[in-house]
């Protein structure tokens, strides 16, 4: 699990000796004692993300570490919520100003331009006290993302936003868990925690969720059609 400290728009999630896997900025597999969630302004467009992160952490009283996973979000940290279940805890910041829709009857659009998306608005940090191998830790990212998509579809009608990110962590010294799928204690606990934390974060916000991509401040609809063929 992790211990939390919140100051000046930065949430520290401390888990000494943890192994992390991040899909966010400067992500990948790392060993670190903590991870961070940083709220950025709406007009955020730094020349150097690394310098920005370093400065924000220092200004908030935290010691910047290059090995620490960092998530960036437009959601204020006052809306962060943490859920615990069994061997898992999940921290979530959730907002839907930039929904990403995936219609099942696409009308044949085009691929979007490659450009900077708004900072992630549904971010998750999932940590377990179990020790996971490479495969189980990687699979936990998929489990968390699946639970996030199911929760958002049921709550808001969208599976995600244009810039969501997931960080997962395990305790290398904990009890070994060979698998992390949805039918395992780790996977099931993660799914429950994601559901509760995401809904609680959304419920903490005064702003209503958009009912369509068109009514959102930002967003995208994947209406391009892919070609299907037999191998």
UniProtKB/Swiss-Prot annotation:
Residue pairs linked by disulfide bridges in the UniProt entry: none
Superkingdom of the source species: Archaea
Gene Ontology molecular functions: adenosylcobinamide hydrolase activity
Keywords assigned: Hydrolase
Region listing for Disordered, in residue ranges: 200-231
Pathway listed: Cofactor biosynthesis; dicyanocobinamide salvage pathway
Enzyme Commission number(s) from the entry: 3.5.1.90
InterPro entries, per database record: AdoCbi_amidolase (IPR002808), CbiZ (IPR052209)
Record bears the keyword Ubl conjugation: no
Family matches, as PANTHER family: ADENOSYLCOBINAMIDE AMIDOHYDROLASE
Role of this protein: Converts adenosylcobinamide (AdoCbi) to adenosylcobyric acid (AdoCby), an intermediate of the de novo coenzyme B12 biosynthetic route.
Protein name (database record): Adenosylcobinamide amidohydrolase
Native organism: Halobacterium salinarum (strain ATCC 700922 / JCM 11081 / NRC-1)
Lineage: Archaea, Methanobacteriati, Methanobacteriota, Stenosarchaea group, Halobacteria
């Amino acid at each position: 699990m992790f211990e939390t400290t919140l100051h000046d728009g930065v949430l520290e999630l401390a888990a000494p000796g943890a192994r992390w896997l991040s899909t966010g900025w400067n992500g990948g597999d790392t060993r670190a004692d903590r991870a961070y969630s940083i709220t950025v302004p709406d007009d955020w467009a730094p020349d150097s993300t690394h310098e920005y992160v370093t400065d924000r952490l220092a200004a908030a009283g935290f010691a910047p570490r290059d090995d620490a996973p960092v998530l960036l979000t437009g959601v204020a940290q006052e809306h962060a919520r943490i859920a615990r279940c069994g061997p898992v805890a999940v921290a979530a910041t959730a907002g839907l100003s930039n929904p990403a829709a995936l219609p099942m009857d696409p009308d044949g659009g085009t691929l979007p331009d490659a450009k900077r998306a708004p900072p992630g608005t549904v971010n998750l940090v999932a940590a377990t006290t179990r020790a996971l191998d490479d495969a189980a830790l990687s699979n936990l990212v998929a489990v968390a993302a699946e639970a996030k998509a199911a929760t958002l579809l049921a709550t808001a009608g969208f599976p995600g936003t244009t810039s969501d990110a997931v960080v997962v962590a395990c305790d290398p010294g904990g009890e070994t868990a060979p698998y992390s799928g949805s039918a395992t204690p780790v996977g099931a606990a993660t799914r429950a925690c994601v559901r509760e934390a995401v809904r609680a974060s959304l419920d903490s916000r005064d702003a209503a969720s958009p009912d369509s991509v068109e009514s959102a401040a930002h967003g995208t609809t994947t209406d391009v059609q892919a070609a299907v063929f037999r191998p």
